[in-house]
Swiss-Prot record:
Its cofactor is Mg(2+); Mn(2+). Belongs to the SELO family. Pfam families: SelO (PF02696). Keywords: ATP-binding, Magnesium, Manganese, Metal-binding, Nucleotide-binding, Nucleotidyltransferase, Transferase. The gene is ydiU. It catalyses: L-seryl-[protein] + ATP = 3-O-(5'-adenylyl)-L-seryl-[protein] + diphosphate; L-threonyl-[protein] + ATP = 3-O-(5'-adenylyl)-L-threonyl-[protein] + diphosphate; L-tyrosyl-[protein] + ATP = O-(5'-adenylyl)-L-tyrosyl-[protein] + diphosphate; L-histidyl-[protein] + UTP = N(tele)-(5'-uridylyl)-L-histidyl-[protein] + diphosphate. The active site is at D240. This is Protein nucleotidyltransferase YdiU. It comes from Aeromonas salmonicida (strain A449).
Amino acid sequence: MKLINTFATELPWACEPVVPQPLREPRLLHLNRGLLAELGLDGVSDTDWLACCGLGQPLPGMQPVAQVYAGHQFGGYSPRLGDGRALLLGEQLATDGQRWDLHLKGAGKTPFSRFGDGRAVLRSSIREYLASEALHALGIPTTRALVLVGSKEPVYREQEETGATVLRTAPSHLRFGHIEYFAWSGQGEKIPALIDYLLRYHFPELENGAELFAEVVRRTARLIAKWQAAGFCHGVLNTDNMSLLGLTLDYGPYGFIDAYVPDFVCNHSDPDGRYALDQQPAVGYWNLQKLAQALAGHVDGDALATSLAQYEHQLMLHYSELMRAKLGLTQWEEEDPALFRQLFQLLASQGVDYHLFLRRLGEVTGTGEWPASLLALLPDPDLWQGWLELYRVRLTREGGEDAVRKAQMDAINPKYVLRNALAQQAIDAAEGGDMTQFERLLAALQQPYDEQPEYADLATPVPQWYCGGELSCSS
């Protein structure tokens, strides 16, 4: 392994040194061995990972720090947030030259913990581990999970739970909130150094802050387009949870939709639906506006405005490409928006499972009967006849072989999705000491487009009573 600490040494004013705190009777629950090997960390023993992530004993060369940042939370500005329970242990320099943060969540109190205990619970740690690996397998930019450690440490949320840690990794955990903190705390002179750090280590192909902001806009637009196409709701899109690298960051009360509910809210702390599924594109733009305001004075205002003006076009362009691919369409036609709109209206009014519908839609052929597996999903198949006929006519104009189209659709419409019901089953078993369900679910999610008949029980509709469940922010 090759550990470096560029953030801690080059931006010492943006972090505080912190000693991680040990958990009571920690136990190693999972290692992402494939990813560890990719990062050149496969030489670290299981014992050392347990010591690092559970016993408060960083590996040689690590300099743990908690980063400081601010953020707009549910529309209101919080001037000083920071890593309240996570530590940047160091950065691994992989064989290809890419830097990878080693970021330990649940490591104990930091100067930014405020009234928190600095801990993470097993429930939320499992959810983060599963989600980061699931989104990665779906091709959605995200932080990744390396190590999961459980313990007998009592942690109090709505009820008593047990403490855990997740070692997560990404090229950087820099957020919109990092820029905001220095912009609005009277330390604006430090923003050029942050921009320079980002350009040198993460955007070497770019030359200045204007180009950097344009790229952040582009990446944010594409990320949210991918979320929308995948039916993924983040749940807490505060600016401190927005990555400057365009990654899915900080998994809290997230959720994939089951039945198609456009205004799906997965966070019960969001009664007004500010961060509902269908609001994510607009929230992304609002957050980028706040980032632009923080950069004003350091980046040309006209350049900021020009980049912001491109956001909606970039998001809709990528989203349209993704949805056409999900329907097996390779060409754009003027009627496509109407075709999509009618589909979404039917899905919503009928409460049809979004993921299973798209997966089984791939079985439609140019002629013959409608697939029985598809019809079985529809409460009232007669209501669908008009749309299905339009879709078949559209496929006929496209041409191509049915088998080829099905293979292409299967490669973008997952069979296995991280449904909250499945995650909860894995959590319940893990809290009882059984990691088997977690292991099975993780394995299925890491190959979401493959048939994997041994995991077929994980690809069935969830009970109707569970659909649309909201979750707590507590973790």
